[in-house]
Amino acid sequence: MKHLNSISEIYLKRDQEILLLFRKAKRMVEYPTTMAKLCDYIAKMPASCYYLADSTAYRYVCKRIKGEKPKFGKYQAMKEKLFEAFYQDFLRLRQMEQYKEYKTKHLVYVCLDLPAPNIGMAPRYIQMKINNYFRNKKTSFITR
């Protein structure tokens, strides 16, 4: 559990994955391209796991089980799709025989380790993360 105003460990791992996806995307896109197009491509690439805080994922699943559909802001479409994909994976695992005895909390932890359809961030926020990384790294930014 994270403390007030602290940075969650999962978000640090997510930022590392964004940089890995950035390097992968640079090799895959056709040049000439722009940073915005690269970030749009990264936003659609699959991630190695769900980069959601465990408590947030658990609360979302509990609300969905009760029949409520949590509201997201109008600018959080990517996050809403990610949570919905997470919930569908949760339901799929719940039906499997080997997970029948798992409690909801433990099944959420298992689901968080599954591959995610995307990183769950809008391209502009991905671009901000990448720009901040290279600004703080104090090296030249080469896009090729």
Regions from the PLM with identified roles:
Residues 1, 125-144:
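C-terminal engagement modules used by replication, chromatin/transcription, nuclear envelope/ESCRT
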Residues 1-27, 31, 40, 48-100, ...:
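Basic, amphipathic alpha-helix used for nucleic-acid engagement in HTH/winged-helix/SANT-Myb modules
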Residues 81-85, 105-110:
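Phospho-regulated, low-complexity intrinsically disordered regions of nuclear gene-regulatory
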Residues 34-37, 103:
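Short, solvent-exposed linear patches
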Residues 40-61, 109-132:
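Short, basic interhelical loop/turn and adjoining N-cap
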